[in-house]
Amino acid sequence: MRRLLSLLILLIVLIFPLFAGRVRSASTVCAIHVDVEQKMLTLFCGSEIAARYPIATGARDTPTPLGVFRINRRFSGEMGGFGTCFLGLNVPWGDYGIHGTNRPESIGTNASHGCIRMRVADAEALYARVPNGTV
């Protein structure tokens, strides 16, 4: 009985770090940084860079808004030119967001009406990782 109890305690001690790591990563706060000059979106989770994606930003006459905004709405499904997902931003003076594009050749340029364009696969990957409220 004593040996069984010792083995059970050892098993718990060995397995616990696996579950603790999952809990820690699930509660890590993520944030998005958009560099409009470099045309790059960086996802930070905690203090680590979790992903970097090339983007397209607003054209000269319709620039991407600058500031700190939160994701406040999410849509998924086929959306024509917007790809398959949309992350809406709480920009007070307009309807802007992060979304895919059916014009992947525009990535790396100033081509949108102010939104942040991504390759469809990149937008889907980001959509899966960030909830409403993400800055």
Model segments located where?
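Positively charged n-region of N-terminal signal peptides that target proteins for export
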Residues: 1-4
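Compositionally biased, low-complexity intrinsically disordered regions
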Residues: 7-8, 27
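Bacterial N-terminal signal peptides
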Residues: 8-17
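Membrane-interface motif at the C-terminal end of an N-terminal transmembrane signal
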Residues: 16-24
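Exported/periplasmic cell-wall-interacting domains
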Residues: 23-31, 59-68, 73-135
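A structural motif detector for short, solvent-exposed N-terminal "entry" segments of globular domains
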Residues: 25-60
